[in-house]
Design a protein with these regions (language model features):
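PLD/PLD-like phosphodiesterase catalytic module centered on the HKD motif
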Residues: 1-162
């Protein structure tokens, strides 16, 4: 359930505007409301879960064509292990690999020996050309959403894309 705490329209010096919303999201489904008309999603996240990436592409209410993710932690081996412990692990791995080969899924990692990137930022390009920028506390991971008492606070800016 999304609980909107604040809404406003912001006008910039050039006259363009963006709708601003600050919200508390307690569930993955409420967070997915930001991605309803998404065509392309660019994401910087501290942690991610292969199963959640798979869910984004499989969700019947979304039309995500591509996802590009920069992962800022150093838990790559843990992701492999967590995927092995997932129902349908082979199916998920095969689907993600197919998406990667088709160019629809790109996952970048940082050199974690030098830096950890703790940012959570999503740029959503919608099918109508509008864009949504989300900045907040929500990781693209199972831990961020399932069985957690954590509330993710996000700020979203929506523009017409120009």
């Amino acid at each position: 359930m999304t609980k909107t705490e604040f809404e406003a329209t912001v006008e910039f010096d050039d006259g363009s505007t963006a709708d601003l919303e600050m919200a508390a999201d307690k569930s993955w489904d409420s967070f997915l409301n930001y991605f309803g008309d998404a065509q392309h999603v660019y994401c910087v996240t501290y942690s991610q879960s292969p199963a959640f990436i798979y869910k984004m592409f499989q969700n019947q209410d979304l039309a995500v064509d591509s996802l590009e993710v920069i992962v800022g932690d150093n838990q790559h081996d843990d992701y492999r292990r967590s995927l092995k412990n997932t129902n349908n692990a082979k199916k998920i791995a095969a689907q993600l690999e197919s998406l990667r080969q088709d160019g629809d899924l790109l996952i970048h990692t940082v050199d974690s020996a030098r830096v950890l990137l703790h940012t959570k930022l999503y740029i959503v390009e919608n099918q109508d050309g509008s864009r949504t920028l989300i900045c907040g506390s929500a990781n693209l991971s199972k831990q961020a959403w399932q069985g957690s008492k954590q509330t993710n606070v996000n700020i979203a800016w929506r523009t017409d894309g120009d």
